């Protein structure tokens, strides 16, 4: 009986197996997943997770030599694509921005800790569009001139502080960056790095950075965990407490400006612009206060980071410092400080700003984008939900674009044969680098940052020489040119000492005179 049944059933099973295999084969052959970009093979379950440890920008650069400008990684089931050329990054993130302007989901850092109000993390949608439009109108190239007086005053204080306490040059850079951004956002300059507002916002940045790190919370891998009641989930309770605390902080700063606007005694600031245009942008006070706070948190860290790298470059490449000082002597002279009125006449200083942003990036892999729909690029399939990372480190140091000396600090690469600023590479939007990002997510504060860097660099080089420090025997102190440390949202050079002296006899007196005219004694 068993043998008869087996003989009757076997052909059916064979036919079924043939159909299933044929169907599966056809599905596989037709599946776009067969055409993923090339990339390293991963391990079972975790995929390429181990490749993403350490300095990712160096790993991506090395792997790019084998796999090309478009690389695919499987990160524990999450598709990730790395963009290793300016053209590929611009093709996708700029020219197909409609598909690639989202951010990866981050339940703790974005949804809970910041209530979806942190514009750099906010998912692509209506809230982001309204916040982005408001920020753009307050910080676009046509209006940032109103911040010139603040930036000039802060550059004077920076220069005076460094000349008075050269051993604390980095502290003065960080104070100035915080003060300038705080003044431009809230018209409330802090008194020092220890100012409660600065300390509280720096604490916010540190907590946010920890929460946003990959693998920081299991809920990012198991989204159902977000529905666990707060009393049973310490991570959720702490994130909610952070949101309450930080909302109160940002709203307090914002309401201070609101009170001054009501009295009619406010000065130009981003917060006052947001308040005056609140109805037009349809943003709540909470959304506006978080938008202003985000601009401070992002701007202060990045500007001070760039200035630290620039200081290192002045020591390692002294010939660029001398050329910049020669330009300052020719245009400004030695009887007054540089100002924004000199901007058009100082092309080498402006080129130095571009080079400082290109040579060492404060964020070597930028902020990730996410695709919102399936796409095909150059024959390769990029599925919806893919995280895309532009390897800014390599994009800014590509020898095919910047020449064989791309790894070196050389502002002259941004000048033409007549010594004027040359047009930037095709996909850099006239910045001559891609440090500010791409597409609809490009840094909205880049014009403010460029201006701050210009006046800080011009004034410091006008007044001082920056050289390599030595020990008591005149032996140069160690200097790690290639190393870096990760500090919150940015990377900074390994701490180093610098020898800073007045460039000519009257320099310090002129700076002090300007400082007193600002009301500081």
From Swiss-Prot:
It comes from the Eukaryota. Pathway: Secondary metabolite biosynthesis. Pfam families: p450. It is found in: Membrane. The keyword Amino-acid biosynthesis does not apply. Keywords: Glycoprotein, Heme, Iron, Membrane, Metal-binding, Monooxygenase, Oxidoreductase, Transmembrane, Transmembrane helix. Its main location: membrane. Its EC number is 1.-.-.-. Heme binds at residue 443. This is Cytochrome P450 monooxygenase ARMGADRAFT_1018420. Melleolide sesquiterpene aryl esters are cytotoxic secondary products with anti-cancer potential. Armillaridin shows therapeutic and radiosensitizing effects on human esophageal cancer cells. Armillaridin induces autophagy-associated cell death in human chronic myelogenous leukemia as well as of hepatocellular carcinoma cells. Armillaridin can also inhibit the differentiation and activation of human macrophages and thus might have potential to be developed as a biological response modifier for inflammatory diseases.
């Amino acid at each position: 009986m068993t043998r008869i049944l087996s003989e009757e059933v076997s052909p059916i099973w064979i036919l079924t197996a043939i159909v299933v295999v044929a169907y599966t084969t056809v599905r596989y052959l037709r599946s776009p997943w067969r055409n993923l970009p090339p990339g390293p093979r991963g391990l079972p379950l975790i995929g390429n997770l181990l490749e993403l440890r350490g300095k990712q920008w160096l790993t991506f650069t090395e792997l790019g030599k084998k796999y090309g400008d478009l690389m695919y990684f499987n990160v524990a089931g999450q598709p990730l694509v790395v963009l290793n050329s300016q053209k590929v990054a611009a093709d996708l993130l700029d020219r197909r921005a409609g598909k690639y302007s989202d951010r990866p989901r981050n339940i703790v850092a974005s949804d809970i800790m910041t209530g979806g109000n942190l514009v750099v993390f906010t998912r692509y949608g209506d809230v982001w569009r309204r916040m982005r439009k408001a920020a753009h109108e307050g910080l676009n190239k046509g209006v940032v001139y109103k911040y010139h007086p603040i930036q000039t005053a802060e550059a004077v204080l920076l220069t005076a502080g460094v000349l008075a306490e050269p051993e604390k040059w980095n502290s003065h850079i960080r104070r100035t960056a915080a003060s300038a951004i705080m003044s431009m956002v809230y018209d409330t300059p802090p008194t020092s790095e220890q100012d409660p507002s600065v300390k509280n916002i720096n604490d916010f940045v540190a907590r946010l950075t920890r929460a946003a790190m990959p693998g920081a919370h299991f809920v990012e891998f198991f989204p159902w965990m977000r529905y666990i009641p707060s009393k049973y989930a310490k991570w959720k309770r702490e994130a909610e407490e952070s949101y309450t605390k930080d909302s109160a902080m940002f709203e307090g700063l914002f309401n201070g400006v609101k009170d001054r606007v009501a009295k009619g005694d406010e000065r130009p600031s981003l917060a006052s612009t947001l308040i005056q245009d609140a109805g037009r942008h349809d943003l709540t006070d909470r959304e506006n206060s978080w938008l202003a706070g985000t601009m401070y948190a992002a701007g202060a860290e990045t500007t001070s980071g760039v200035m630290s790298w620039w200081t290192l470059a002045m020591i390692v490449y002294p010939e660029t410092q001398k050329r910049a000082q020669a330009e300052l002597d020719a245009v400004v002279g030695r009887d007054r400080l540089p100002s924004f009125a000199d901007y058009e006449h100082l092309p080498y200083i402006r080129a130095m700003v571009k080079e400082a942003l290109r040579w060492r990036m404060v964020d070597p892999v930028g902020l990730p984008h996410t695709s919102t729909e399936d796409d095909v690029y150059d024959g390769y399939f990029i599925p919806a939900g893919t995280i895309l990372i532009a390897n800014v480190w390599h994009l800014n140091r590509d020898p095919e674009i910047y020449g064989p000396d791309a790894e070196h600090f050389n502002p002259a690469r941004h000048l033409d044969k007549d010594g004027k600023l040359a047009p930037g590479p095709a996909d850099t939007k006239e910045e001559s680098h891609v440090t500010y990002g791409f597409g609809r997510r490009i840094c909205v504060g880049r014009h403010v940052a460029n201006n701050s860097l210009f006046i800080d660099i011009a004034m410091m080089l006008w007044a001082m020489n920056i050289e390599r420090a030595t020990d008591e025997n005149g032996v140069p102190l160690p200097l790690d040119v290639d190393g870096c440390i990760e500090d919150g949202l940015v990377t900074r050079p390994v701490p180093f000492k610098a020898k800073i002296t007045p460039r000519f006899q009257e320099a310090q007196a002129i700076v002090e005179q300007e400082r007193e005219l600002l009301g500081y004694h």
